Amino acid sequence: MKILVIGSGGREHALAWKIAQSARVSEVLVAPGNAGTATEAKCRNVAIKVDDLDGLLALAQREAVALTVVGPEVPLVLGVVDRFHAAGLRIFGPTAKAAQLEGSKAFAKDFLARHGIPTAYYAVHTEVDAALAYVREKGAPIVVKADGLAAGKGVIVAMTLGEAEDAVRDMLSGNAFGDAGARVVIEEFLDGEEASFISMVDGTHALPMATSQDHKRVGDGDTGPNTGGMGAYSPAPVVTPEVHARVMREVVEPTVQGMIADGVPFTGFLYAGLMIDAHGAPKVIEFNVRFGDPETQPVMLRLQSDLVDLVEAAIDGTLDAAQAQWDPRPSLGVVIAAKPYPETPVTGEVITGLDAVPASAKVFHAGTALNAEGQVISAGGRVLCVAALGDSVLDAQRTAYAGLQPIQWASAFQRSDIGWRAIARERDAQA
């Protein structure tokens, strides 16, 4: 069978790589893909943009694609699933209506409140003066979010009142995130530890994937501005078996049932970005309606089951009878980005050393392309993710960082401390 993966990032390379391992799959088409998927076994890139729904549908029909997996949020919010369903094609992802869980922060917060799912207090504002008054009433620290899609970067954690006021003015005067900031969601600053809790959902049932923890800030020690994510590891030790049970009971299952009650059943990857407090109580920071990036890379490294079997079970509504098998070892992925990301990065630089990466590490491509000479060049902010398994998080970290040593280009940089929280936990446990 032929499978289509929509997208061009590290997440899509990891999904395509995993799908290609299925004995049932003859070829994986990736639209538009990157330099990594161009050379991955059984994979072929097709130059169709993720927002070209007509082109994607025509491709799936022309190539007799059996199954489509959607990577990024943009085509989901645009309604790619609705279009494929209307044409009678099998596709894994939420409808445009269900994708509003990510497409609109206000929709998500209203949904959480309506269904009694734990989250931060919040208010939605469109007027600068009212928003400023609310911020002054609540005080800092406080979180200001652009309402629409902002590629994971439309969130300001304001530690002072001045920062909060600046963020409100920026977003509501339309100069920070374009249309996405025409409404802002202002919410409580939550204390605790973050975790990414991703489940596969078939409309009625949820099958949890391995947990993970992302590193949003650009700099070591979680400093500097927010990014799409600078690295991740799996599992997230903050999600103990007890916390896992609470998340399923208090967040995931009520979300699946709430979407049914609201008449928009959810099928796809449901990503709950959580804050776990000192007592193990989860609160939802955000929903995404797709797998995380860079969490997909270390999580796929640990998945031992056939991903195609799981996706088919989800489309058929039989996830309650499915099981996912995981490598018990932790995995860790380090993103190599291009300076001055998250500002507009330098692109078009030739990347060397990819063929010298040891077999103990796996390189997933994100913002890469092939130039006319067939050389791999940088083509985005987050360029590569080097991931590895290990007997401990420290071991996985060492292997991943050793794996990225040979890789070079002029503007490359990465954090040197991915996994630090889990490694500190391991050290404490041994003390």
UniProtKB/Swiss-Prot annotation:
Quote the InterPro entries the UniProt record gives. ATP-grasp, ATP_grasp_subdomain_1, PreATP-grasp_dom_sf, PRibGlycinamid_synth_ATP-grasp, PRibGlycinamide_synth, PRibGlycinamide_synth_C-dom, PRibGlycinamide_synth_C_sf, PRibGlycinamide_synth_CS
Q: How is the cofactor bound?
A: Binds 1 Mg(2+) or Mn(2+) ion per subunit.
Which GO terms label this protein's molecular function in UniProt? ATP binding; metal ion binding; phosphoribosylamine-glycine ligase activity
Q: Which PROSITE patterns match?
A: ATP_GRASP (PS50975), GARS (PS00184)
What EC number(s) would the UniProt record show? 6.3.4.13
Q: Which Gene3D superfamilies match?
A: 3.40.50.20, ATP-grasp fold, A domain (3.30.1490.20), ATP-grasp fold, B domain (3.30.470.20), Phosphoribosylglycinamide synthetase, C-terminal domain (3.90.600.10)
| UniProt keyword annotations, A-Z | ATP-binding, Ligase, Magnesium, Manganese, Metal-binding, Nucleotide-binding, Purine biosynthesis
* Single Gene Ontology BP annotation: 'de novo' IMP biosynthetic process
- Catalytic activity field: 5-phospho-beta-D-ribosylamine + glycine + ATP = N(1)-(5-phospho-beta-D-ribosyl)glycinamide + ADP + phosphate + H(+)
Q: Which residues bind Mg(2+)?
A: 286, 288
Q: Where is the ATP-grasp domain?
A: 109-316
| Pathway connected to this protein | Purine metabolism; IMP biosynthesis via de novo pathway; N(1)-(5-phospho-D-ribosyl)glycinamide from 5-phospho-alpha-D-ribose 1-diphosphate: step 2/2
Q: Where does ATP bind?
A: 135-196
- Domain of life of the organism in this record? Bacteria
* EC primary class: ligase
Cofactor(s) needed, names only, are: Mg(2+); Mn(2+)
The similarity comment for this entry is: Belongs to the GARS family.
* NCBIfam families named among the record's database cross-references: purD
Q: What is this protein called?
A: Phosphoribosylamine--glycine ligase
Q: Which organism is it from?
A: Xanthomonas campestris pv. campestris (strain ATCC 33913 / DSM 3586 / NCPPB 528 / LMG 568 / P 25)
Gene name per UniProt: purD
